[in-house]
């Protein structure tokens, strides 16, 4: 069985579109689990009513919004206990499957590779670029510490932060910056890569991971650095992870956060706060491995 876990927040139409992109593939033996992260506009309850009587779609109404990792972990735990699937595909509600015979290709890759985690080719329709893998190296402690200190300084509202927010509100400039970053990394998205940080908008977990791990993502973060932390944990535990261009999805980016934060300054402040907290969690994970080894 393949289970799709979709984290929902606010934008009902996008979640329905995501579900339809899965159902249109007419795959056998699948289940779709929608996790509503306590949407204040009642869209979670509306989805619950919309899919009532649909045996393929479960809608979970979370009693809090504790962010990306926590919401997905709720879906992961529920799915693991109820369905015990061969694969879990955790995806944003703004992601659509693009590959034909997605399930068959997934099983073929697994039969050959026996991976714990796989990241598909994720193409951002918003910025017209490939997003996974995010880079080709694991993060180091000094690198994360430097980021943590940088985000700590960025929590204050300064002239620089206002200027940065203004620049990010320009679609052309923002797209140019994102595309330039990707080009500078010199990643060939047509190649297979092993044990690299993957993009979090679509992550595929095999039974090898599911049988061993209680959580899909390290608890404690709200947004950002979830897959970077996951990459580090898998690296330390010697779990095989991979990027495969055989499986493709489309990412219509930032739909939920754009609904909540239509003001770019507020969105940037929120992002800096989350980045600071997430890098703090990342540092604690690294320190724990340094102190205790891999048996955690």
Label for each model-derived stretch:
Residues 188-189, 196-215, 219-247:
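A short, conserved alpha-helix in the catalytic core of glycosyltransferases
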Residues 96-134:
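Conserved donor NDP-sugar-binding/catalytic core segment of glycosyltransferases
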Residues 157-172, 184-205:
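A recurrent flexible, glycine/aromatic-enriched loop bordering the glycosyltransferase active site
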Residues 242-262:
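Active-site donor/metal-binding and catalytic loop motifs
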Residues 63-82:
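Glycine-rich, basic loop-to-helix element that forms the pyrophosphate-binding segment
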């Amino acid at each position: 069985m393949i289970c799709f876990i979709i984290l929902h927040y606010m934008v009902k139409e996008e979640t329905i579109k995501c579900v339809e992109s899965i159902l249109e593939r007419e795959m056998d033996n699948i289940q779709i689990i929608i996790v509503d992260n306590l949407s204040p506009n009642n869209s979670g309850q509306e989805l619950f009513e919309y899919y009532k009587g649909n045996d393929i779609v479960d809608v979970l109404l979370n009693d809090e919004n504790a962010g990306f990792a926590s919401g997905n972990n709720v879906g992961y735990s529920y799915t693991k206990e109820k369905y015990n699937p061969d694969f879990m595909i955790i995806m944003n509600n703004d992601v659509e499957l693009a590959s034909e015979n997605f399930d068959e290709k997934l099983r073929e890759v697994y039969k050959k590779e026996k991976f714990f985690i796989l990241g598909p080719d994720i193409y951002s329709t918003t910025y017209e670029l490939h997003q996974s893998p995010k880079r080709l190296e694991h993060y180091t402690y000094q690198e994360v510490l430097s980021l943590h200190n940088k985000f700590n300084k960025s929590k204050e509202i300064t002239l620089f932060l206002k200027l940065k927010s203004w620049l990010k509100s320009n679609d052309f400039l923002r797209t140019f910056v994102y595309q330039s970053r990707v080009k500078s990394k010199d990643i060939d998205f047509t190649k297979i890569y092993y044990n690299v940080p993957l993009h979090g908008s679509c992550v595929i977990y095999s039974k090898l991971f599911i049988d061993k791990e209680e959580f899909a993502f390290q608890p404690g973060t709200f947004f950002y650095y979830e897959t970077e932390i996951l990459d580090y944990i898998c690296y330390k535990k010697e779990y095989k992870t991979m990027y495969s261009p055989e499986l493709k999805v489309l990412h219509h980016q930032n739909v939920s956060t754009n609904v909540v934060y239509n003001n770019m300054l507020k969105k940037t402040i929120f992002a800096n706060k989350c980045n600071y907290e997430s890098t703090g969690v990342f540092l604690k994970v690294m320190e724990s491995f340094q102190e205790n080894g891999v048996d955690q």
